[in-house]
Structure formats: C-alpha cells, structure tokens
A protein has these predicted regions:
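Multi-bladed beta-propeller domains
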Residues: 5-22, 51-73, 112-125, 160-179, ...
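Solenoidal tandem-repeat scaffolds enriched in leucines and small polar residues
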Residues: 68-169, 173
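Residue position within the beta-strands of beta-propeller blades
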Residues: 34-38, 49, 85-90, 138-143, ...
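Structural motif
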Residues: 43-49, 95-99, 103-107, 148-157, ...
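Conserved beta-propeller blade repeats
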Residues: 20-29, 34-35, 71-84, 124-139, ...
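Loop/turn-rich, solvent-exposed surfaces of beta-rich toroidal or solenoidal domains
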Residues: 141, 182-278
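Blade/loop signatures of beta-propeller domains
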Residues: 1-9, 97, 105
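Surface beta-strand/loop "capping" patches
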Residues: 303-324
Length: 324
C-alpha cells in the first residue's frame, strides 16, 4: 500500500470490532503478546484483551476481562508488572458536582492475577489514564474538585499496584498546568514521563506535549524539562482556564521512545486531520502516517520491552481493622 510522503509499508488489521464499535485506550503488555483495550458491548463499556503470536498476529478471538456491573462502565486499562491490570470504572457511583450528578465520575480498580476485582481509589471525582512507571508503580491523573481554585487541581499521582502509597508526583500546589493527561514512562530514564498538558474548560484532554521530571519535588517550573516540538522551557506565567485552546499543534496519546523523541498523535491545525507523528526536541514534527479523510490515534510500537519490577503487595483483605 502506498504510504503518504512517498514510502510504502504493509498495513495489517489486528482487530476489527463488530458492528463498527469504538476500540481504543490500548495498552500493550511488556511481552508484546497481549493487548488490552476498551470496547463497548450490549451491556456497556468493557476492557477486552487480544492475544498476539510471536509475529504480532492475533492468536485468538478478543475476550472480555471486566465483569458486568449494572449501570457501570469499565475502560482505560493498563497492565501491571505483578500480573494484574488496573482500569477505570464508574462502579463507584459518584458524579461531577458542577453537572449536578448528571455526568458520572470514575475511580481506578484492579484485577488481580487471580481474577479478583478491587477498588483502589476513593476520590470524589475522576481518576484517569493509568500507566506503569519504571519502578512498577502506577501513575495516573487525578481531578480534585475542591476549593475555589479547582480548575488548577489535576495533579499526576502515583501509587503501588495494590493501591497503597498514593501521592502527588507533579502539579500539586501549582497553577500551571491546569491538567496533565496520558502520562507515559520515558524508556530507560526513570523519573521522566511524557504527558499532554491542557486547560480546564475548552478543548478536551488535548494540548501541549511535554516531558516532566516526577522524581524531584514535583514542582513547576523545575519539573518541566521540555515542551515539543523543539520548544525549550519558557515562561509559565500563562495561568488561565482555557490554557491551550489557541496553541498548535495539539497532541494526544504520547508514546515516548526517549526524552528526545516521542511518537504521538497530533493535529497540526484546526482543519487538519489527526495523524501519527514523531516529535523531537530539535524542532521537528515528522509525519509517520497521516490520512486526509480520517483521524489516526494511539500509536504503540509493537515490540517487547523490559518489564518493571513488581512492588510487594501490602494489602491484607482478611483484616477487619485498618493499619496505618
């Protein structure tokens, strides 16, 4: 098949959802033999898994991993290094205050290696975009709807896969950025993650592509290492609600290859399609796959990667008291 910009490649469909259903929010296992993703069925939104063979071809039909819970949706999965899976769910039955309960909120849950399901987060509002850091902890975005300045309270959090040790690692007690979404560990560089920063209202979870230091104090501006493409760290005095509405290009779904190169979904202008690009810190935004009549999202290199260590599970479900 002819690829844009004069090169050729072989495209392969790994999975075609029945009935044209949505399929996305993908996470590839470190062994590259399993792909978890979100897809709806007749009962709601669920997490599914596709098994892959050594050549990256589907080895079996996709199977559903999450249980059916009345009036609840499950989505946004990530594998954990201890053999479990973390995902978001509306089974907590909470809602966003400013919508007077009409819009559901979600918390993070865990499927253990034994198949058991347990709630990890008990926040008032949304916990989103879990992924795994180099030390095996889970990083995610949390929205704290509290106080008069809640439009600036969406820090990056980290916790152990069992839900213990929850703490803010970037953006706490700061006015910039309003939010950081889609955090992903930079390979081979512990303490650094790629993410998309954006405002509170305005465009939805799309914005500027950055690399952050989450091993230090988590403070701004010291924690901001780079903004792409090719933009060095500059003044962060632009504190406002609709932070990135007029910022181009806009980014989604970063997959860092290093702190200098990030495979990412990008829209270069308001009338342009979303495509797959390679962004680098030298100012380049190289198109990898762009089609005029459709949008392309969520690039993931289909390859094996080193598995992080598995933190010790410290939860004791049989206890009837709390241990602090």
């Amino acid at each position: 098949e002819e690829r844009p910009y004069g090169r050729t490649t072989n495209l392969q469909t790994l999975f075609r959802p029945p009935g044209g259903r949505f399929v996305g929010e993908m996470d590839l296992h470190w062994d590259a033999d399993r792909l978890a993703f979100t897809m709806p069925d007749e009962t709601g939104w669920h997490v599914y898994e596709l098994t892959l063979d050594a050549q990256g071809h589907p080895a079996a039909p996709a199977r559903r991993l999450t249980p059916q819970v009345e009036d609840a949706d499950h989505f946004d999965p990530c594998y954990t290094s201890d053999g479990g899976l973390v995902f978001a769910s509306t089974a907590n039955m909470t809602a966003v205050p400013c919508w007077h309960g009409k819009q559901k909120a979600c918390s993070l849950y865990r499927i253990g290696p034994d198949g058991s399901v347990r709630q990890l987060c008990f926040d008032q509002d949304l916990d989103l975009h879990p992924s795994v850091l180099a030390d095996g902890q889970v990083v995610y975005s949390r929205w704290d709807y509290s106080g008069t300045m809640h439009m600036y309270l969406r820090p990056l959090m980290a916790m152990n896969p069992d839900g213990t040790g929850q703490r803010a690692i970037f953006g706490s007690n700061a006015y910039w950025p309003n939010a950081a979404y889609f955090p992903r560990q930079v390979p081979g560089e512990p303490g650094r993650v790629a993410a998309v920063v954006c405002g509170y209202h305005g465009v939805n979870r799309m914005g500027e592509l950055v690399v952050l230091d989450v091993d230090g104090s988590g403070k701004v501006p010291a924690g901001l290492l780079h903004r792409f493409p090719g933009r060095s760290v500059s003044s962060l005095d632009d504190v406002r609600d609709n932070l990135v509405d007029n910022s181009w290009p806009k980014f989604l779904h970063p997959q860092p290859l290093s702190s200098r190169y990030v495979l990412v979904s990008a829209q270069v202008a308001g009338n342009a399609p979303w495509g797959i690009y390679l962004a680098d810190m030298f100012g380049n935004l190289v198109p990898v796959w762009v089609e005029a009549d459709r949008d392309c999202f969520e690039p993931i290199p289909l390859r094996r990667t080193p598995r992080p260590p598995a933190p010790t599970d410290r939860v004791q479900p049989h206890r009837t008291d709390a241990l602090v």
